[in-house]
Design a protein with these regions (language model features):
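Intrinsically disordered, low-complexity regulatory segments
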Residues: 1-65
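Short, surface-exposed basic-aromatic patches at helix termini and helix-loop junctions that form
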Residues: 208-216, 232-241
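Short coil/turn segments at beta-strand junctions that form active-site/ligand-binding loops
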Residues: 63-65, 99, 187-190, 216, ...
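Gly/Ala-rich beta-loop-alpha elbow adjacent to hydrolase catalytic centers
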Residues: 194-199, 203
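Active-site nucleophile loop of the alpha/beta-hydrolase fold
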Residues: 221-228, 243-247
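Lipolytic serine-hydrolase domain surface
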Residues: 234-329
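Active-site catalytic motif of lipid deacylating hydrolases and related acyltransferases
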Residues: 17-20, 27, 33-47, 68-187, ...
Length: 331
């Protein structure tokens, strides 16, 4: 009687999938950075043509500060499709009316090119986006291919082997974008980068080049962000907004030893000791979804919707930066 090969076949496919994933992770940074390096680290930056909505993306060279919002890992292009993110952007625009608020930088692309604009892969990403927007569990799970792809870019930004090249490209995208809205690199105004979730690593990586190469005064607001401390020391100040029930943030912090406060010589500990980091307790807020920072329905003990409390906490910091940077000029 012939023996069954089912266990052997299953093991073959399992190990084959593991090997394919490993090889994919190994060569993806090369595929991502290869064209950029071949072009001499100068590549055509994709410029989005997203019209202003009367609150966000309003060119104003007379603005006293520029605020750049970098979205979480679920985005496929510079235009956010999240109602929660749109909600906090509009609230920040109202609370910081004298600042120029921008949101149309795709943080997970070295040349700002949206996933849906790739000539060969755009059909796949459009399909993944459609699946993600569906409410069925198995469809939305397939849509998380977008998140996985963007997480790979976060890992590239954090990897010391590729970080210098990748983060420098992201800084070029940011400065090119700022100039479209009237930012003068010769007379730089305060640049406030507001990052959500995984975009914190992109911001931390770009800060080093924005400060060293372009001499910009950069302030970073991290909303439940995952990032390594490398490069963030070039920021003038870093604020972290963390909820007490955000377990995703605490889990990811385990994989960032440079931000642990226990090692005496850790960069994050030195920044904290120097008074250049501030942690703001957001109360019982989760990372995302119901009960998250951007939830409209959950409320604080004072009855304030979570999204309004988050926007107000960030606006207080942004307005303080604007006042503090204007005071020396008036004196």
């Amino acid at each position: 009687m012939p023996t069954s090969n089912v266990p052997l076949d299953a093991a073959f496919w399992i190990w084959g999938c593991v090997l394919a994933v490993f090889l994919g992770f190994a060569i993806y940074p090369i595929l991502t950075l290869g064209p950029y390096i071949r072009a001499g680290c100068r590549i055509n930056i994709h410029r989005n043509r997203i019209p202003p909505d009367n609150k966000v993306r309003q060119p104003n060279p007379n603005g006293d500060a520029f605020v750049l919002f970098l979205s979480g890992v679920g985005r496929v292009s510079a235009l956010t499709m999240s109602r929660r993110e749109q909600g906090i952007l509009h609230r920040l625009a109202e609370l910081c009316s004298d600042a120029v608020l921008l949101d149309d930088v795709f943080a997970y692309s070295i040349n700002n090119l949206p996933l849906v604009s790739h000539r060969r892969l755009s059909p796949m990403w459009r399909w993944a986006l459609r699946q993600k927007l569906k409410k069925r569990l198995h469809n939305s799970a397939l849509g998380y291919l977008i998140n996985l792809r963007n997480i790979l870019h976060i890992l590239i930004s954090a990897d010391s082997r590729y970080a210098m090249v990748y983060n420098r490209g992201c800084a070029h995208v940011i400065t090119d974008h700022l100039q479209q809205y009237g930012y003068d690199l010769a007379q730089p105004k305060p640049l406030v980068i507001v990052s959500y979730s995984g975009a914190g690593q992109i911001a931390a990586g770009a800060v080093q080049h924005l400060s060293d190469e372009y001499r910009l005064p950069v302030y970073v607001l991290m909303l439940a962000c995952f990032f390594t401390a490398s490069g963030i020391d070039r920021a003038s100040h870093v604020w972290e907004f963390i909820g007490t029930t955000d377990q995703a943030y605490r889990f990811c912090l385990l994989f960032s030893p440079s931000r642990w406060l226990i090692p005496r010589l850790s960069l994050w500990r030195r920044l904290t000791a120097a008074g250049r980091t501030t942690r703001i307790d957001m109360g019982a807020m989760k990372h995302t979804g119901r009960g998250g920072y951007l939830d409209r329905n959950s409320v604080t003990p004072e009855g304030v919707p979570f999204i309004d409390a988050t926007a107000q906490a960030m606006a207080d910091v942004i307005n303080r930066i604007r006042i503090d940077t204007e005071s020396p000029k008036e004196a």
